[in-house]
């Protein structure tokens, strides 16, 4: 792919949010136009007035402070929205690795990937994560979640800019939200139980996958003007697999049996950390420059740092450091 093609693709990604928003605005006003001649003029005028107020509100992206007023418990509250944000959604236009995994290995001899060429240390990294409400109301709800992490060798023109890894992660989640349960100075927000499958969708020898059952708790503490802290520890049990067919039989040694996620919101910024037994990922989201905010509603400038094992499934037993920057969308 030529440099110009990459520029076009990235430009389309930037404008996608603005185009979608403009289409929604047109549909909104069309509702009022369709009322012409069917209702009294006063009622049609009131429709325009109401829709105008809604559109003006959309012109000013909500800040992290506004979004966080609801608390993380509301992230698991059933609503009329067919699709909701799940984990962090970001697009890093530049991600640099200290040590690319040129020949991925595994204790399973069927999963030894031979060396072909040296990967580019610079690439594009992005994650899409959404969830949908299936059943239940109020305190008890069943959700379907989907997360995809992709690493794209967009700057490697010599090898046709391949995607070196795509990790697909569907899951089924039961969520319980207690009523204002205080715990060690914080508020217990939710208790989730889930079944998750993660795979890179590759055939042998590049195939990597694992299945888990997990329990996750969410708690939050509001410090008023000093921000808000959300803690989300998760423990998992690896299921399935055997010594013969398991693509990555020693994955627990590198990724452990759980992770600890912390998010701190202050003003219009957010810092999040995900820690496992042998890895740490830090994400910092800050208000985007005005021009970018006009193109993509609610977009943030995003910085990311990763150190350890398991940035992707293919790299589950490869230790390296990466850092990158790009844009992200806020948590709900």
What is the predicted role of each segment?
Residues 17-20:
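N-terminal signal peptide c-region/cleavage motif recognized by signal peptidases
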Residues 55, 302-304, 308-313, 324-331:
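A cross-kingdom marker for long, charged
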Residues 169, 282-286, 320-332:
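Outer-membrane beta-barrel "beta-signal"
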Residues 33, 38, 42-158, 167-170:
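Outer-membrane beta-barrel initiation region
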Residues 22-29:
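Cleaved targeting-peptide boundary
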């Amino acid at each position: 792919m030529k440099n110009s093609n990459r520029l076009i693709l990235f430009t389309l990604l930037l404008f996608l949010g603005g185009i979608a928003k403009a289409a929604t605005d047109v549909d909104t006003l069309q509702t009022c136009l369709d009322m012409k001649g069917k209702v009294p003029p006063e009622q049609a005028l009131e429709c325009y007035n109401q829709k105008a107020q809604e559109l003006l509100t959309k012109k000013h992206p909500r800040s992290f402070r506004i979004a966080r007023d609801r608390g993380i418990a509301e992230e698991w509250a059933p609503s009329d929205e067919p699709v909701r944000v799940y984990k962090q959604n970001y697009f890093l236009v530049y991600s640099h690795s200290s040590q690319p995994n040129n020949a991925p290995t595994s204790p399973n001899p069927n999963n030894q990937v031979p060396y072909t060429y040296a990967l580019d240390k610079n690439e594009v990294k992005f994650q899409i994560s959404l969830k949908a409400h299936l059943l239940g109301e109020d305190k008890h709800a069943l959700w379907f979640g989907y997360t995809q992490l992709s690493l794209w060798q967009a700057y490697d023109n010599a090898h046709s800019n391949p995607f070196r890894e795509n990790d697909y992660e569907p899951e089924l989640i039961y969520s319980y939200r207690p009523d204002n349960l205080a715990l060690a100075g914080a508020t217990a927000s939710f208790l989730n139980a889930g079944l998750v499958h993660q795979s890179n969708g590759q055939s042998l020898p590049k195939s990597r996958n694992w299945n888990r059952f997990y329990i996750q708790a969410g708690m939050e503490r509001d410090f008023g003007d000093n921000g808000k802290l959300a803690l989300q520890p998760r423990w998992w049990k690896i299921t399935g697999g055997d010594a013969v067919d398991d693509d990555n039989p020693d994955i627990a040694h590198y990724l452990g049996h759980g992770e600890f996620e912390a998010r701190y919101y202050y003003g219009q910024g957010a810092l999040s950390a995900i820690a496992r037994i042998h890895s740490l990922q830090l994400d910092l989201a800050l208000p985007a420059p005005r021009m970018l905010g006009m193109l993509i509603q609610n977009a943030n400038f995003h910085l990311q740092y990763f150190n350890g094992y398991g940035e992707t499934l293919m790299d589950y037993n490869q230790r390296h450091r990466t850092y990158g920057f790009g844009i992200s969308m806020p948590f709900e």
